[in-house]
């Protein structure tokens, strides 16, 4: 293909109006507000799919992490004397998040593009609880004993926002995956995405809420059909 045509590909003039792709990466998040009273931040592993129509971007991704508890009895279950009747059996609960976002590429220059995104995030925090009872030992002193272990979770939907900063790594022509004589252009990028999402746990005692702020760094691939 002629150099002029390759330059036209870089500015999008030879592409069809749509593209599909994926991203996979790592990152981290920190809770703010009263969320930080009960939870610490954690590393995140992320992956997902993208669809683009001209400058519009639609993104669905999944994030996995294991934050740490600061509060060993977040439901604050006590007996009449103030002793714990529940304690976390899991120091690091499992955090699963599923995000759906839409955005628009507001700036594209050379190898760099910037796309603000907004959407919703469903998250689930799950862990095990020890149920405690108190029994007298041989010295007639009451000691805590684990009576039962059960699983529990907190989940919900919340607003989220992010900004995708894509730095193009390379591009190449490939065969069109749906067959025929057409070709497609595959572009790989380094994607840096700061994000914020709201979260609250009404069942905790006291209830906690705040935002989780974080950053992910991903490899992103995008396939566009050529006119």
Annotate each predicted stretch with a short phrase:
Residues 22-26, 58-62, 100, 114-118, ...:
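Membrane-embedded beta-strand positions of outer-membrane beta-barrel proteins
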Residues 33-39, 70-79, 127-136, 175-179, ...:
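Outer-membrane beta-barrel translocator domains and adjoining extracellular loop/strand segments
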Residues 16-20, 39-45, 56, 92-98, ...:
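Residues that define the transmembrane beta-barrel architecture of outer-membrane proteins
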């Amino acid at each position: 293909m002629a150099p002029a045509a390759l330059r036209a590909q870089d500015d999008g003039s030879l592409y069809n109006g749509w593209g599909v792709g994926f991203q996979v990466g790592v990152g981290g998040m920190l809770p703010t507000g009263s969320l930080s009273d009960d939870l610490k931040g954690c590393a995140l592993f992320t992956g997902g799919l993208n669809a683009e129509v001209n400058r519009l971007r639609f993104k669905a991704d999944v994030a996995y992490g294991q934050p740490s508890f600061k509060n060993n009895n977040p439901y604050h279950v006590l007996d009449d004397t103030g002793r714990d009747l529940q304690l976390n059996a899991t120091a690091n609960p499992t955090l699963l998040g599923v995000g759906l976002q839409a955005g628009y590429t507001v700036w594209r220059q050379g190898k760099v593009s910037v796309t603000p995104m907004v959407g919703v995030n469903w998250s689930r925090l799950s862990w095990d609880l020890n149920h405690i009872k108190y029994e007298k030992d041989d010295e007639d002193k009451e000691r805590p004993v684990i009576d039962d272990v059960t699983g529990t979770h907190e989940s919900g939907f919340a607003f989220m926002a992010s900004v995708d900063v894509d730095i193009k790594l390379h591009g190449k022509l490939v065969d069109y995956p749906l067959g025929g004589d057409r070709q497609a252009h595959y572009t790989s990028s380094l994607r840096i995405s700061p994000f914020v999402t709201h979260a609250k746990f009404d069942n905790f005692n006291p209830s906690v809420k705040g935002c989780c702020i974080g950053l992910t760094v991903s490899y992103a691939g995008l396939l566009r059909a050529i006119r």
